[in-house]
């Protein structure tokens, strides 16, 4: 039976049937041809083309198997590098991605019989990082290209430099915040100190008799000198003796300044109390209403 011509309904139907992956047991690796059922595979193995191809492979089977193995390994690593890079992925999941290609090299044509054996081979050769856990094998590609290695090292160095610069900026920012906080605290302390009342000393002039008492309000800078002069003047009274009389007369007797100050304060307090009593407190609205009601009651009583 001849083969259907291209574009005919029979050819289109066969193409739709052969689209996608088929059973691996019905795939001929020697001829690289996929059959759709067991009968088709049996007919293919009895065909003249298949027998001729098997005779060619039988001349040097090891070389043919090695070629298939190298091609399988090359395609597998290329897809891993381009699709996932150096990311870690489950080995069986990635193998399913690899066999999606209809024209891929099947593993039954290579020297590896199982996926576990092939995964261990990749780890021993240093082509991939292989990790095994309770979920199975995980692989990740190892990039050995010198240019890529230099680029990765430069990227890591730049990341470390950026990290150190960021840490330095954060440290400087913390120091600035600390200095600003300390300066603010010092300013508040200075304001509190300046707002406090300074102690005032009363400097009394008792040098001349008969003159009114003079009080000088000095600042805290002259406190010690003014205080010493005051007590020296108070504690050392001066006396004069008359030659004509036998009695000693007191020429200069210091006055009790504090007693006079107390008297003046009492007098001022008394005057302020008298003035406060004389000033009438304004009445409230309730008091006005009560007064009006009282006046009305008085008028009613008078009329009666």
UniProtKB/Swiss-Prot annotation:
Biological process per Gene Ontology, one example term: DNA damage response
Recorded superkingdom: Eukaryota
Keyword Iron-sulfur: no
Keywords: Metal-binding, Nucleus, Zinc, Zinc-finger
SUPFAM superfamilies assigned to the protein according to its UniProt record, in alphabetical order: beta-beta-alpha zinc fingers
Region (Disordered): 204-228, 261-291
Zn-finger region bounds: C2H2-type: 26-50
Presence of the UniProt keyword Metal-binding in the record: yes
Gene3D superfamilies in the cross-refs: DNA/RNA-binding protein Kin17, conserved domain
One Gene Ontology CC term in the entry: nucleolus
Entry similarity comment: Belongs to the KIN17 family.
Record's protein name: KIN17-like protein
Lineage: Eukaryota, Fungi, Dikarya, Ascomycota, Taphrinomycotina
């Amino acid at each position: 039976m001849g083969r259907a011509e291209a574009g005919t309904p029979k050819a289109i139907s066969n193409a739709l049937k052969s689209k996608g992956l088929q059973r691996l047991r019905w795939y001929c690796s020697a001829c690289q041809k996929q059959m759709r059922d067991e009968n088709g595979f049996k007919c293919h193995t009895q065909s003249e083309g298949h027998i001729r191809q098997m005779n060619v492979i039988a001349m040097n089977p090891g070389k043919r198997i090695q070629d298939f193995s190298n091609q399988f390994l090359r395609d597998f690593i290329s897809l891993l590098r381009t699709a996932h890079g150096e990311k870690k992925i489950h080995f069986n999941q990635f193998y399913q991605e690899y066999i999606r290609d209809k024209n891929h090299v099947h593993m039954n044509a290579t020297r590896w019989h199982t996926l576990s054996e092939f995964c261990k081979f990749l780890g021993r050769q240093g082509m991939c990082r292989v990790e095994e856990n309770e979920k199975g094998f995980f692989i990740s590609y190892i990039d050995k290209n010198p240019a890529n290695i230099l680029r990765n090292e430069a990227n890591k160095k730049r990341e470390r430099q950026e990290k150190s610069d960021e840490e330095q900026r954060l440290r400087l920012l913390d120091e600035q915040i600390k200095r600003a906080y300390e300066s603010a605290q010092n300013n508040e302390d200075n304001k509190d100190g300046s707002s406090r009342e300074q102690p005032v000393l009363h400097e009394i002039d008792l040098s001349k008799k008969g003159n009114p008492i003079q009080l000088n309000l000095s600042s805290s800078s002259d406190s010690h000198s003014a205080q010493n002069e005051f007590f020296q003047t108070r504690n050392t009274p001066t006396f004069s003796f008359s030659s004509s009389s036998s009695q000693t007369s007191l020429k200069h007797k210091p006055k009790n300044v504090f007693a006079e100050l107390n008297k003046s304060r009492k007098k001022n307090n008394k005057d302020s109390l008298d003035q406060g009593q004389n000033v009438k407190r304004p009445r409230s609205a309730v008091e006005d209403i009560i007064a009006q009601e009282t006046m009305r009651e008085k008028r009613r009583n008078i009329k009666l």
